[in-house]
Amino acid sequence: MIQMAGLMSADEIFERARNAAAAATGPDEKAMKIDYPALKEKIRAALGERKVALCHINKFLPEGYEDQGRFNLVLLTAGNVVFDMVIGDSYFRYDVVSVSQLDKVQLIDAMWDNREKRREEPFLSVRLMHGEEAHLLLALDDEERSSLLAFARAVSAARNPER
């Protein structure tokens, strides 16, 4: 979900990450073992004094992230810098890229085969690409979709402003 009402601090992003960690644990899974004070300091160190304009939390890890963590946050700062933070039981990493360095912004609106529910369901993804890297934002429900579209609009406007 993306938060747009005002700018967020590193501590506010930490609170969102902590809430997402609780939500990322299914009823048949063991709870995540995160050192929350250490995570708070890592997020503070990563963001410094930067203010975050948009925050999207992927409830389900995109393909390619599975071995690294349980969920990720994609942030857009007020200065148009993207942070992709992956958080797991004893894992934290982040990538940083300026919106101006993105080679391509790709939005995919399609259907996926939900084998658990035995039906096709809609999904929306935004792929932020630079070099060999791609940062993915996923939306599987209507609330996430509208938030994800807001993120895509903000990145597109910053990357390709109308003149």
Positions of predicted regions on the chain:
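Canonical phosphoinositide-binding patch of PH/PH-like domains
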Residues: V126-L149
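Hydrophobic, Leu/Ile/Phe/Ala-enriched alpha-helical segments that form helix-helix packing faces
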Residues: I43, L47, Q106-D109, V155-R159
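N-terminal non-globular leader segments, chiefly Sec-dependent signal peptides
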Residues: R16, A20-A21, E116, E120-P122, ...
